[in-house]
A protein has these predicted regions:
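Short helical segment in ABC ATPase nucleotide-binding domains corresponding to the A-loop/adjacent helical element
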Residues: 51, 103-112, 122, 126, ...
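ABC ATPase NBD coupling module
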Residues: 61-62, 72-89, 112, 234-238
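Conserved ABC ATPase "signature" region
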Residues: 65-72, 119-140
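Conserved ABC ATPase signature
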Residues: 143-149, 153
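Catalytic Walker B motif of ABC-type/P-loop ATPase nucleotide-binding domains
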Residues: 170-173
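Helical segment within the ABC ATPase nucleotide-binding domain
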Residues: 185-196
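ABC ATPase "signature
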Residues: 228-229
Length: 252
């Protein structure tokens, strides 16, 4: 089976500073891939390359290719970026619901993309909230502001927004770092359920989390993807001593 995402010879500079060095990576479809490494290693920069969010940063230069379903996203015209961002959704470290009602948060994307109207929107909202296990909690609060939800509920709502527009890839940048341990485990369980329909890439400082939820893991160091493989292999039999040193806490 062809990979969902293929990264080849990817290099990125912030001004004169090179943040990514010749990254090559294949990400499987409908699986969870984790990127680990110490702060500043380039893992979040790499994640943001997968939906061209780094384009928004001044003085960024990128070389190489990122192909999703065979299409090189760095050859896309700017007019095609909304299509890319619909297909590839981002879940941030801090949940960022719109200052709107719960209902309008989920309905916003389908309306903007002209996916549905009227009663169909109602169905999309319910289906999306059910997918993230929020419907039973919020079905009587749909008209309340999303800003009044708990942190965990806000994060689930942000994921529901991506479900609503039928994103195919979910990029998660430290999605549990603001949550308590119980909420973290619930988000991890949600990720496991969602992977049957989505390709998920998660950046995390939490190595236990990477070991729990992912099938494949990449270890990054100083802008290089130093090692990539099955998560069980990375954590039990790493090929590179620097990977072993990081996982065992000798540095990081």
């Amino acid at each position: 089976m062809s990979p969902k995402i293929t990264v080849e010879k990817l290099n990125l500079w912030y001004g004169d500073f090179q943040a990514l060095l010749d990254v090559n990576l294949e990400i499987r479809e409908k699986a969870i891939t984790a990127l680990i490494g110490s702060s500043g290693c380039g893992k979040s920069t790499l994640l943001r390359c997968l939906d061209r969010m780094n384009d928004r940063i001044e003085d960024v230069r990128i070389e190489g290719s990122v192909r999703i379903d065979g299409e090189d996203i760095y050859r896309m015209k700017k007019a095609d970026l909304p299509r890319l961002r619909k297909k590839v959704g981002m879940v941030f470290q801090r949940p960022n619901p719109f200052p709107l009602s719960v209902y309008k948060n989920v309905a916003f994307g389908p309306k903007v993309h002209h996916m549905a109207g009227g009663a169909e929107i109602d169905e999309i909202v319910e289906r999306s909230l059910r997918a993230v296990h929020l419907w039973d909690e919020l079905k009587d609060r749909l008209n309340e502001s999303a800003l009044g939800l708990s942190l965990e509920q806000k994060q689930r709502l942000c994921i529901a927004r991506l479900v609503a527009v039928k994103s195919e890839v979910l990029l998660m940048d430290e999605p549990c770092s603001a949550l308590d341990p119980v909420a973290t485990l619930r988000i991890e369980e949600l990720m496991r359920r969602l992977k049957s329909d989505f390709t998920i890439v998660i950046v995390t400082h939490n190595m236990q989390q990477a070991a729990r939820v992912s099938e494949e893991t990449g270890f990054m160091l100083l802008g290089e993807l130093l090692e990539f493989g099955r998560t069980t292999d990375i954590f039990t039999a790493p090929r590179d001593k620097r990977t072993e040193d990081y996982i065992t806490g000798r540095f990081g």
